[in-house]
Design a protein with these regions (language model features):
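A short, acidic, amphipathic alpha-helical segment used as a generic capping/interface helix at domain edges
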Residues: 137-151
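Short active-site segment of divalent metal-dependent hydrolases/proteases
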Residues: 12, 164-165
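Conserved histidine-centered catalytic loops in small-molecule metabolism enzymes
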Residues: 52-86, 107-121, 189-199
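Active-site-proximal alpha-helix that buttresses catalytic centers in soluble enzyme cores
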Residues: 2, 7-83
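Glycine-rich phosphate-binding loop signature in dinucleotide/nucleotide-binding domains
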Residues: 51-54, 148-154
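Domain-level recognition of soluble alpha/beta enzyme cores
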Residues: 172-198
Length: 199
């Protein structure tokens, strides 16, 4: 049994732009930063979330907004942070907002706080021609759950994205009216790769 805490990144630049231009925002920006609000959200979670001190492993998407969120939340905690492409937002391909930076650039900025040993130098999930399918997302989520179940740690935090985490938690994609909250710990007691939480 694993106790998984799923945390959506803080408010990012594309979240704000989306309110102005809709889905065009996802092509207008590449790998956006947290806004000032997002920086505050993640810092506040790090300050007030008591459970963070019991976390044995942090798994984080290698996109900038999630790396910023994770390092803000856990800056005062001695815990391993491991970046994994499998935690990128859906679709992991096509939309510029989900195109991560090269590994060497990430290492320069975040190492040794974050471990990037699992990443290829370039974003292997990135594809300018093809949109990731729901079936591919489903496989990504199940592979991630299998990876977690093989780990020795019991209490694990995942810092990722709205659509990926909703599918990880509930096995479905949520609409814009039911998005996950920014910087809120959704808990899942993971028993198998088909375990889902109740809403």
């Amino acid at each position: 049994m694993k106790n998984i805490y799923c945390i959506r990144h803080g408010t990012a630049e594309h979240n704000v732009l989306f309110k102005e231009v809709g889905e065009k925002a996802y092509m207008m920006l590449r790998d956006s930063n947290l806004t000032n609000v997002g920086q505050i959200e993640s810092a506040q979670m790090g300050k007030y979330w008591i459970e963070k001190n019991n976390i044995e492993l942090v798994l984080v998407s290698p996109l900038t907004r999630t790396l910023q969120t994770a390092t803000n939340i856990f800056k005062d905690v001695n815990v391993t942070m491991l970046a994994l492409d499998e935690l990128k937002e859906y679709p992991a391909s096509y939309e510029n907002i989900n195109h991560r930076k090269d590994r060497k650039e990430l290492v320069l900025k975040y190492h040794p706080t974050v471990n990037f040993k699992q990443l290829a130098e370039t974003d292997k999930l990135w594809d300018t021609e093809n949109h990731e399918t729901i079936e591919q997302l489903d496989a990504r989520v199940k592979n991630m759950k299998d990876f977690i179940l093989k780990r020795k740690e019991t209490n694990i935090a995942i810092v990722s994205h709205n659509t990926f985490l909703a599918y990880f938690l509930y096995g479905e994609i949520v609409d814009y009216d039911n998005e996950l909250k920014h910087c809120f710990p959704y808990k899942l007691r993971l028993k198998s790769n088909t375990t889902y939480a109740n809403k």
